[in-house]
Amino acid sequence: MTDICSLSLTAVAQALQKKELSAVDVTTACLDRITATEPHLAALLYVNAENALARATTLDSEGPDAARPLWGVPVTLKDAFSTRGMPTTAGSRMLEGYTPFYDAFAVQKLHEAGAVILGKTNLDEFAMGSSTENSAFKVTRNPWNLNKVPGGSSGGSAASVTAGQCFASLGTDTGGSIRQPASFCGCVGLKPTYGRVSRYGVIAYGSSLDQVGPLTRSVEDCARVLTAIAGYDSRDNTCDPRPAEDYAATLSSRPLKGARLGIPREFYGQGLSDEVRAACEAAIQAARNQDAELVEVSLPHTDAAIATYYIIAMAEASSNLARFDGVRFGHRSADIKNLDDLYVHSRTEGFGPEVKRRIMLGAYVLSSGYYDAYYRKAAQVRRLIRDELLAALGQCDALLAPVSPVTARDLGGNTADPLQIYLMDAYTLSLNLAGLPGLSLPVGLGAKSGMPVGMQIIGKPFEETQVLALGHSLEQALPGIGRPAL
């Protein structure tokens, strides 16, 4: 008998529509998988078992609905999405015990599409990290090697999808937080164009950088989820009004044959590990074998992207997290004598060390006397980085680049050196600065580490159709990496 949890989202969705499987069958299989794997992975912060089974039972009683593309499909959510009646912590003691009274827009869209919400996944606190080790509650492990990190900050989502606990998970990407864990865990992850998916109901980190996207096991699955969650929402004034497309229906619209693909010189220079380089070069050769045209392009300001990103992200974080003060919701210190004590003690007790570091640095770059030297300068360089990327994309259909310079590192490694951790985002954060779409696709296993390697397909604004179609074509041209023996 086929293991339900090993199927793709697309295969399960089709079987559900044909009544070859019931929503209760699929949901029960995923909950059993969670029970078996969660003690090893620690991917989930909250399991919504009772409500998920009730939802599946209701769906079965109503019968399949072809107009609902995720009918009966179990999914998980990064715990940065507001969920009515379910705890939402952002991985922080500051929000421990907080239960919203409304759903985020993307969660509403999943409900409308017929999905079954299984639970909430672990993340770095307030999405600030690249390993999911910064969570206040637990440390998530990589399904390929339990001694390795899953990446971050959406590490729980990537681990959950790869381990077969669910068929898709929603994450957020501020500087690579969907793409990097997808690369480390060997699944597909998409950061859409800024404004393609509403951020309403998402706990904000960097408001000009954050974007919502799916993590799945295949590009076709990713396209199906994006179709479900994309669309205009008036409650997010950065949400773009142009209508969403049926991304799954257009996957054959752009084959690799005849495609002009750019290779950014700066992404393949010093610092790229040998095993990541080899896997990416093999993927480039696979594209060439499909008659794609490969051209070298240059992005001269790549070296400035890390500093630019962290100045802007930390400045926005210091502003966004000012609302967590112990007054309205979240952690409230008991050790208070006056209003100042309430603010200081609540925030000191509620926030972890990495969040405090970013708040302090953000406040510094926004302070009088330093605003022009840091924040204003970073905003200017951000424009240069965006212009360079758009100029490069003007020469080709998409760019191919590594997601991370290395494969997943050991748990506990480099945790005392924030700068080394920040460097892990060197190849992903430019897309957030520019607001461009990027798809992380597994292209091989490291020859030395045996860990997954991901490659980014970078596209022009709102050209997710082409990014996904090229990703689908490249996925078909590659042998695949299999699944971890968890």
From Swiss-Prot:
GO biological process assignments: translation
Key words, A-Z: ATP-binding, Ligase, Nucleotide-binding, Protein biosynthesis
Coiled-coil segments on the chain, per record: none
Catalyses which reaction(s): L-glutamyl-tRNA(Gln) + L-glutamine + ATP + H2O = L-glutaminyl-tRNA(Gln) + L-glutamate + ADP + phosphate + H(+)
Enzyme Commission designation: 6.3.5.7
SUPFAM superfamilies the UniProt entry points to: Amidase signature (AS) enzymes
Superkingdom: Bacteria
Top-tier EC class: ligase
Pfam families xrefs: Amidase
GO MF terms, alphabetically ordered: ATP binding; glutaminyl-tRNA synthase (glutamine-hydrolyzing) activity
Active site: K78, S153, S177
Role according to the record: Allows the formation of correctly charged Gln-tRNA(Gln) through the transamidation of misacylated Glu-tRNA(Gln) in organisms which lack glutaminyl-tRNA synthetase. The reaction takes place in the presence of glutamine and ATP through an activated gamma-phospho-Glu-tRNA(Gln).
Family the UniProt entry places it in: Belongs to the amidase family. GatA subfamily.
Subunit structure: Heterotrimer of A, B and C subunits.
Name of the featured protein: Glutamyl-tRNA(Gln) amidotransferase subunit A
